[in-house]
Amino acid sequence: MIRLVFALRRKPGSSREEFQDYWLNKHAPIVASVSSDLDILRYVQTHTLTDPANAAAQNARGSMEPEYDGVAELWWASEAALTANLQNEAAQKAGAVLLEDEAKFIDLPNSPLWFAYEYPQINPSPEDVFAKVKSNIVRVFFPLRHQGQISE
């Protein structure tokens, strides 16, 4: 499987709470409505907590990227399936619908995205465990910056 990872920052002038509410309650249903046109197999939103633990984790690691307000992840069956799907007109229209809505609440120039393969290192069982507000499941993201002394 291949996935899109989209590290999101809210548009200036909106609070994190407003951003996350819109993303979950307005944008997510739009993604769901076009998911079959885009052949999306899975869509996950990870909402950043406003918690002192975030600052502590960042301070322990030195200079880090400014905090993101959340991370969106979308999965497709394969790179070939994704590439083929993006050639069809319905997928192109669906992508335009998503981009139009994203421009309403996401600071797009400051919200990087990339396609990636995942390599699970620890995989909980059962796999149908979902994080919910006030659950004991918390996900941690460490966007890594390439160090100049390490070759690509």
Could you describe each region identified by the protein language model?
Residues 1-152:
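Macromolecular interaction modules
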